[in-house]
């Protein structure tokens, strides 16, 4: 794995939660709804869910977390969740780097994620990385989600 990335530890949860709120605030603005799951989650829920995921992080020169992606493995299948980059570090390839690092780290064959159908910037990024939408569903908070998959031969 690229030395720019590391696996988050429990001591990082508070900083990750702060990053999550800052990163997904712009998502809420873009889609016109605050019903974004990452913004609806409490700190306590976030802490409890941490153990269910592996979280890959990137820090800046000062040691502050500037990007993260969580994932979980099931055989050769990876579920990706909560790709997030600090607003002041966007458009520098950080999200793409995190996603690529997960692929390299896991050596899995199938990667899946979901995002709001109005998240055009995210969908564009995922498509550049080789993800394709395989279904769309309306969520329980009046949002529709695109489920995307990438398969590596």
Task: Give, region by region, the residue ranges found by the protein language model.
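Conserved acetyl-CoA-binding loop-helix of GNAT-fold acetyltransferases
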Residues: 82-85, 91-104, 124-128
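A short helix-loop-beta-strand connector motif used in the catalytic cores of GNAT acetyltransferases and
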Residues: 45-57, 79
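Conserved beta-hairpin
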Residues: 53-69
């Amino acid at each position: 794995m690229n030395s720019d990335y590391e696996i988050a530890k429990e001591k990082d949860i508070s900083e990750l939660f702060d990053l999550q709120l800052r990163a997904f605030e712009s998502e809420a603005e873009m889609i016109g709804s605050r019903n974004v799951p990452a913004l609806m989650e409490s700190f306590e829920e976030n802490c409890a869910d941490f153990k269910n995921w592996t979280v890959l992080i990137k820090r800046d020169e000062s040691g502050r977390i500037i990007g993260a992606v969580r994932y979980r493995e099931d055989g050769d299948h990876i579920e990706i969740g909560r790709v997030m980059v600090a607003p002041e570090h966007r458009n520098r390839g950080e999200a793409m780097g995190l996603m690529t690092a997960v692929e390299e780290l896991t050596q899995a064959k199938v990667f899946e994620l979901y995002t709001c159908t109005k998240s055009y910037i995210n969908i564009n990024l995922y498509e550049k990385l080789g993800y394709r939408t395989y279904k769309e569903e309306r969520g329980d908070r009046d949002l529709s989600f695109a489920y995307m998959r990438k398969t590596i031969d």
